[in-house]
């Protein structure tokens, strides 16, 4: 069972994560090189039908919890090659993408430029965003990122620092009680991501509190892997709709989505 016991050498952990996603960024650019603008559009949504459902369900849930609007300046923490950032910018939101991997950021910049999307991407460590001024954003969100960092509380504290007073952050973590993360994933041939950790809802809320957030609220969503057959996506969506709203059953959902606010001035 994976638990949030973090490796003592945080620098080594970060270097490994940076190297992993630098490789992802280089691979992305290599696959993209020479393709058309139409291909670039497709790469934003290159997740297949289940993956696109995951993307949209996470966005819809997070933006409802954070009450984010198109008038808000938003920060995406852990944007990798910018798929979520660019989808949202294309939909009229003001989003800045941030990632520890300079190569992933470079890939995001190339794709955004080719698509004519005007936004900013920053290569920075979420635990030390010293280049990002205090009180810069109305909101922040992070998907499938803080589960890998050596010190989630420091990361959450930095996210809180760059929010304006009254700003909201919505982050997600894998639910430690979901059977997928504990054994089903590996029975189906999935690989364990380096430095991955799972959490309970109580642990996530406590980390948000320790980072200084108030008005904390969490909900559990999604019961299926985005790697499932696309033909079953309508069934997954219907099942999620029911199970997420069923007490007891939602205890085993895959994702814990948690919202916190920065106390106003």
Predicted regions: what they are:
Residues 196-211:
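Short alpha-helix
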Residues 127-139:
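A short acidic, Gly/Pro-enriched loop at the edge of an enzyme's catalytic core
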Residues 81-128:
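Class I SAM-dependent methyltransferase SAM/SAH-binding core
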Residues 183-189, 206, 216-265:
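A C-terminal cap/extension of S-adenosyl-L-methionine-dependent methyltransferases
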Residues 2-68, 87:
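Conserved class I S-adenosyl-L-methionine
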């Amino acid at each position: 069972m994976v638990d949030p016991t973090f490796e003592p050498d945080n620098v080594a952990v970060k270097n490994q994560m940076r190297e992993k996603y630098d490789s992802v960024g280089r691979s992305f650019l290599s696959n993209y090189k020479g393709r058309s603008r139409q291909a670039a559009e497709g790469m934003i949504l290159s997740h297949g039908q289940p993956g696109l459902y995951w993307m949209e369900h996470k966005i819809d849930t997070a933006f409802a919890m954070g009450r984010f609007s198109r008038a808000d300046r938003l920060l995406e923490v852990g944007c990798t090659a910018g798929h979520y950032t660019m989808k949202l910018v294309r939909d009229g939101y003001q989003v800045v993408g941030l990632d520890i991997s300079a190569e992933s950021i470079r890939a995001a910049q190339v794709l955004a430029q080719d698509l004519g999307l005007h936004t900013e991407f920053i290569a920075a460590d979420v635990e030390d965003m010293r280049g990002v001024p205090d009180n810069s954003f109305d909101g922040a969100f992070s998907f499938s990122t803080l589960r890998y960092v050596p010190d989630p509380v420091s990361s959450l504290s930095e996210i809180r620092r760059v929010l304006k007073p009254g700003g909201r952050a919505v982050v997600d973590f894998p639910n430690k009680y979901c059977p997928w993360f504990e054994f089903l994933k590996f029975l189906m041939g999935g690989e364990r991501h380096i430095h991955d950790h799972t959490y309970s809802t109580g642990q996530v809320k406590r980390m948000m509190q320790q980072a200084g957030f108030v008005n904390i609220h969490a909900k559990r969503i999604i019961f299926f892997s985005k790697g499932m057959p696309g033909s079953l996506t309508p069934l997954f969506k219907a099942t999620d709709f029911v199970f997420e709203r069923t007490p007891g059953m939602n205890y085993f959902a895959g994702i814990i989505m948690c919202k916190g606010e920065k106390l106003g001035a």
